[in-house]
Amino acid sequence: KGIDLLVVSPCDSVLIDSQIQSIIKRGIPVVVLGQEVATKHYTTLIDFSNYELGRDIGSYVVHTLNGKGTIMELMGDVKGNAAQQRHDGLYDVLKTAPNVKVIAQCRVGWEGPHLEAQLDSLFNTGIMPDIIIAPNDRTGVRINDFTKKRHLKHIDVIGVDGLNVPDGGLHNVEQGKLSATFVYQTGGDKAIQ
């Protein structure tokens, strides 16, 4: 009601599916940014490759570990395809580095509602990775805080989003809370075009 165009960047592509269909039925164009939604009823999709993002993260991990070490992969919500595509890209690179081992993998969601309990469970098994890959920068900072509170050895934490805002990914790399962040293209500039 009262809009000419809807631009949406879904975190949960299944959750908003019915709303998108309803808006399209009213004749309002819908531009979807970042990942496909379950419905094919949208006007335009501006997609960015989470697969390539996963490959970039994998290349960074292999380089940082000099081809030998351990990682823990924490995945976002797998209801959409973004987390799975990132995972696939990461693993395609890791196949080329047999001495880089994934010693734990956990689905924490994009916001990590149970992150601390999940990390407690993982670390209580005695695993200690060299690198933890977080699904986003916010979760990465929480992981860093968790490891510091528990006086664990230094673990490199990699985030995704790379926002250049106060307390964003770039700031947290500068502050040492993240070892690295990878820029996730939001697509807002393309949507405006």
What are the residue ranges of the model-derived segments?
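Short, amphipathic alpha-helical "lid/cap" segments that border enzyme active or binding sites
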Residues: 51-58, 62, 116, 188-192
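Flexible loop/hinge segments that line or gate small-molecule binding clefts
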Residues: 5, 13-52, 63, 70, ...
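Structured C-terminal subdomain patch of bacterial secreted/periplasmic proteins
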Residues: 168-193
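Hydrophobic alpha-helical
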Residues: 1-24, 90, 108-171
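Structured loop/turn residues at beta-strand edges in well-structured enzyme cores
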Residues: 26, 40, 66, 100, ...
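An alpha-beta-alpha
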Residues: 55-100, 104-105
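Secondary-structure boundary/capping motif
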Residues: 15, 81-82, 114, 190-191
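Structural recognition of the beta-strand scaffold that forms the well-ordered cores
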Residues: 5-9, 29-34, 47, 71-74, ...
